[in-house]
Each structure stands twice: as C-alpha cells, then as structure tokens.
C-alpha cells in the first residue's frame, strides 16, 4: 500500500492486493485476490472486490446495494472501461468522464459506439460484440437495450 492511500473503517485487504496513487477506501470493504487499485480511486460503503479486479483512473464506487463480486473476466476492461453497478446506475473509470448515466448505455449499438468514439477512444472496438454479449448476460437489468 503506497502513494498516500487512505484506508479506514472495517477494511480487509489480502492476497497480493496493490493499492496506490492516493486511493481512498472507507467502510466495510473486503479486497482480495491480486486486486490492483490505483489512480485516485474513491471506494466507500459495503463492498467486496475480488479475483484479479483492476480499478484504475478516477474510479468512484459508493454505496452498493449489496456485495459486488468481480470474477476474472472481460468485465475489467469492458469496451475499454471499467464498469460498476451502484445505486445510482453505472459508474465508469479510466479516462472517461465520471458523470456517465444509465441513459448513456442505452440505445443502439451503433449509437453507443459513436458516443464512445466521441470521447476519443477507438481501441475498444476489437471484440466489441463479444464483450457486449458478456455484459448483457452479466447485467440483465435493462442496462443494455441494444
């Protein structure tokens, strides 16, 4: 743990977790399984992050409805984003704005790609459909209305 990280509450960190770059972690948080958290991440509430998760950029994860478990999967870099579910919809990390809303992720696939391209990222297009199919299976609650 380095880089001026601040950790409070009933946080448990184990199994080769790496936390750096001014990350803030508060609350009943359990982090394990080679997790890498960096880049001013702000994680608060009742959260479990496990199994090779990567949380980077200015990620904000607050107040989950329940524990959230990340299996090792394309979810970590879904379309070049890190993607999280929380009470306010979907938050993303990386170089994207923090104020994405659920509305951003609805509509046609073509519209979604154009919106992402608008923010200056083109490399995600490879394996795009495969990752979308994965996400639709993983988040069935009408987040993805292609």
Predicted regions and their residues:
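Intrinsic low-complexity/IDR segments
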Residues: 45-46, 50-146
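A detector of tandem-repeat and repeat-rich interaction/domain scaffolds
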Residues: 1-64
């Amino acid at each position: 743990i380095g880089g001026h990280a601040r950790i409070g509450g009933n946080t448990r960190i184990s199994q080769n977790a790496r936390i750096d770059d001014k990350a803030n972690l508060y609350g009943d948080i359990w982090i394990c399984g080679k997790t890498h958290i960096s880049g001013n991440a702000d994680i608060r509430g009742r959260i479990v992050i496990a199994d090779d998760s990567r949380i980077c950029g200015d990620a904000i994860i607050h107040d989950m409805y329940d524990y959230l478990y990340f299996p090792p999967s394309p979810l970590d870099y879904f379309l070049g984003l890190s993607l999280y579910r929380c009470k306010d919809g979907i938050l993303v990390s990386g170089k994207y704005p923090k104020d994405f809303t659920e509305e951003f992720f609805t509509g046609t696939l073509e519209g979604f790609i154009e919106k992402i391209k608008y923010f200056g990222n083109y490399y995600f297009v490879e394996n795009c459909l495969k990752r979308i199919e994965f996400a639709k299976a993983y988040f069935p609650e009408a987040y993805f209305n292609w």
